[in-house]
């Protein structure tokens, strides 16, 4: 009896794995990209001295081929009954810059916030659904941890000591999301077969100008590509 139950459970696991696949794609920007702005760090000599070259804002990272980095791509309105990852996400403060600039987590997933700088920072998270917090991190404090318990749209985490320091995060109630790499590619893993709405969010375009489309995951795979482009000024009200 136990052997039969074990085989049944094993078979169920294999079937579950077989019908879950990857959603892959690439996000591009069409047109001439905006010039990256210089981050002025003169107010804190420690920050300024940590960069041999000019530090640039990361709000719009696009390569020569138009591939767009730091875009959150996710499946919308999906159900998930599993648990958040046990591996913490990491938000580092290095050279007085948040890294990663854009990231996403599951509700209930631990976030380790690191301070590798020899200067004072403070972590000021500004969610609307989850609890706002503002925690100081002197140079002697190398790590603090936090958890956002509820799903929430993108919000900013900033440093009030260094106003140029900003990171953006979104909290999901499922694991079907990714952030594009420097070549614009993304991979959302373990997606069950089915039809979904997939959405792409980019910082400068914001939540009112996301890109979306319908995809069907069949046979364990699907592809979705997105193109962001500067809107016609005449069409902007």
Regions found by a protein language model. Give the residues of each.
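Bacterial N-terminal signal peptides that target proteins for export
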Residues: 1-8
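Extracytoplasmic copper-binding redox domains, predominantly the cupredoxin/blue-copper superfamily
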Residues: 20-235
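Bacterial N-terminal signal peptides
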Residues: 8-16
């Amino acid at each position: 009896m136990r052997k039969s139950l074990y085989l049944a459970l094993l078979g169920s696991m294999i079937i579950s794995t077989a019908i879950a696949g990857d959603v892959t794609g690439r996000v591009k920007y069409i047109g001439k990209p905006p010039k990256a702005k210089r981050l002025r760090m003169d107010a804190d000599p420690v920050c300024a001295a940590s960069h041999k070259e000019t530090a640039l804002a990361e709000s719009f990272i696009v390569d020569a081929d138009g591939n767009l980095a730091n875009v959150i791509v996710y499946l919308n309105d999906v159900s998930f009954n599993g648990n958040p990852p046990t591996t913490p996400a990491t938000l580092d403060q290095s050279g007085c810059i948040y890294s990663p600039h854009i990231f996403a987590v599951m509700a209930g997933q631990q976030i380790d916030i690191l301070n590798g700088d020899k200067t004072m920072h403070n972590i000021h998270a500004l969610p609307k659904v989850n609890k706002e917090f503002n925690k100081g991190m002197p140079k002697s404090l190398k790590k603090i941890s936090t958890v956002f318990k509820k799903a929430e749209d993108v919000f900013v985490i900033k440093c009030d000591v260094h106003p140029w320091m900003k990171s953006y995060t979104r909290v999901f109630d499922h694991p079907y999301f990714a952030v594009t790499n420097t070549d614009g590619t993304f991979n959302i893993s373990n997606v069950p077969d089915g039809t979904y709405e997939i959405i792409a969010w980019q910082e400068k375009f914001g939540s009112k100008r996301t890109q979306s489309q319908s995809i069907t995951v069949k046979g364990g795979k699907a592809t979705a590509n997105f193109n962001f482009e500067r809107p016609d000024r005449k069409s902007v009200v």
